[in-house]
Amino acid sequence: MTWFIDRRLNGKNKSTVNRQRFLRRYKSQIKQSISEAINKRSVTDVDSGESVSIPTDDISEPMFHQGRGGLRHRVHPGNDHFVQNDRIERPQGGGGGSGSGQGQAGQDGEGQDEFVFQISKDEYLDLLFEDLALPNLKKNQHRQLNEYKTHRAGYTANGVPANISVVRSLQNSLARRTAMTAGKRRELNELEVTLKTVENSEPAQLLEEERLRKEIAELRAKIERVPFIDTFDLRYKNYEKRAEPSSQAVMFCLMDVSGSMDQATKDMAKRFYILLYLFLSRTYKNVDVVYIRHHTQAKEVDEHEFFYSQETGGTIVSSALKLMDEVVKERYDPAQWNIYAAQASDGDNWADDSPLCHEILAKKILPVVRYYSYIEITRRAHQTLWREYEHLQTMFDNFAMQHIRDQDDIYPVFRELFHKQSSTSNA
């Protein structure tokens, strides 16, 4: 009996190629499931893996089967209700496994549950931020951040079966077999020459011939025992991520924490900023992020205080814009930096302050930033701040506005704001 022993060091990844093929084939269904799942997560659990469910009908594959029509005879096991030529009625209220689960139970019908599988954190984030990029990113300076791309990098002794290099593995196999059998082959050739000489000598030396033949057989057996291929020979194509030059950038995150922002509205703003942070940290290595919280006064804070501080107060949006302008002038020269900003608010602002916000943005901020996005989170009618910003949208191409009403709008709005443009200006 022949036994196959799997001695691969990376045996746990034997199905990686099949998994990658499955993710490519059903990417649209998986992305749809992810976009629905992101809104159901807690604020602190956005970057873990995810259980993805796909309707069984969506993963059906083509198959060969007999065509309809014609006469065929079949034997179905367990049949005690029908005889030949009976017509089988369609089940009442037909079943299916992909229903919502709402309704009354019934005795008829059958179906299949949705196909559910787990994707890793990396797979989840890759699909979550696919086709997204910072708009209008330009290479306008010598100091640069790093954007990573995958490149071939020689060969490695470990890898997945999909990356195996057949030619390099066979070359190693030939070299190993040559090195391990070279001495034995020389000895074998010498014994064969000696045997031929003994066979032609007179008188016959039968015992010597028998000894030589035995040694030759043992050497040939040793040579044949050297395996044709061994795990030591296997080589896999290696890939590594290399830093690609890309202009350095800074993202300003401006969040309204005034008393008009209730906890649900703040949670939606935090979800948006967490998505933004994950996108920046995963796509670019050295993007600076400046966090600004504001009510009647604006304050630059660290990441922890930005997301978890309970401080609140009245609403003067211009305080955050003034602070951003000061920070830009002090630390981020527009000639050296690509400057971005994302502002989240419920739109509630002191009426006399909204025209001032318009003026600061139009004269000081929008002329120096690559892209400025304003997200208003409210179910109410838009107020003066939104109307002032609408005038800016008609004047500046680098200004974008979006409206979030509930959690289901967060991810679509995020993708709309940061989708990768077909014709970028970062050449």
From Swiss-Prot:
Residues 78-110 are annotated as: Disordered. Pfam families: DUF444. InterPro entries: UPF0229. Residues 92-109 have a biased composition (Gly residues). Transmembrane segments: none annotated. Residues 78-90 have a biased composition (Basic and acidic residues). Belongs to the UPF0229 family. HAMAP family: UPF0229 (MF_01232). This is UPF0229 protein Ent638_1670. It comes from Enterobacter sp. (strain 638).
